[in-house]
Amino acid sequence: MSVTYFISDLHLSADRQDISECLFRFLENEAIHADALYILGDLFEVWIGDDDISPFSESVASALKTLSLSVPIYFIHGNRDFAIRQAFADKAGMTILPEQHVIDLYGRRALLMHGDELCTRDIEYQKFRKKSRGWWWPRLMLMLPLKTRQKIAKNGRETSKNNQKQLTADIMDVTQSEVELAMQHHDVDLLIHGHTHRPAVHEFTVLERRMTRIVLGDWYDQGSILIAGQEGLALENRVF
């Protein structure tokens, strides 16, 4: 049976071995039989550069590389791991895709993205996103010593947590008009994304065209997977 898997928002870190162990089981037992695996951002809790090598990141790269020998792996940057560059992608056997990418999913055009660009009501975050995805800011950051980047990342995570406490759930969710604009721009009726940690299937109509938006779940409490095949699409969980 032909299937394609989509995952996002794993937020892998060395202090959450239960998440990485669940991922490794999924790669070894399920993804190995797939046509392809798409990772739609936030694979890691934080990524400050491909030079931040650790036994943990190496174990993740090794597991992905093993899968890539049989199954193509595609990756779209998230807001936590936008600093992943070609060096790590090569080590992990991943192909880096543009921020918004259209694929043929068993005869249906599907738009893939991490999804943070759709949350336009979070104005402060969008300002940061524009800066951090520009050409100069990432280059400047990657020129800093590794320890300096580690301190900046730690402070940034603490600031982000404090800011999120002050934001309403509505602000942190996608803006429907942005969803519709993106889908119309790419001429698709299926959008798959992550970021919001609110797994669901949303159906709506735009100009008499039926649209579907599928939101992938996070991996904090269980693995969250979208399975796509000729028979349809299904969101499923995997226990730790």
Language-model regions, residue ranges each:
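Residue-level marker for buried hydrophobic side chains located in beta-strands
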Residues: T4-F6, L37-I39, L111, I192
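Active-site-proximal loop/helix segment associated with metal-binding centers of metalloenzymes
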Residues: G115-V174
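Conserved beta-sheet core of the metallophosphoesterase superfamily
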Residues: G93-P98, L111, D116, D122-Q126, ...
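Active-site metal-binding loops of divalent metal-dependent hydrolases
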Residues: S8-H11, D42-L43, N79-D81, G115-E117, ...
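Core catalytic region of metal-dependent phosphoesterases/phosphodiesterases
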Residues: S2-V3, L12-L105
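Short, Lys/Arg-enriched, disordered terminal segments
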Residues: M1-S2, F240
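N-terminal short leaders/motifs
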Residues: L43-L67, K165-L191
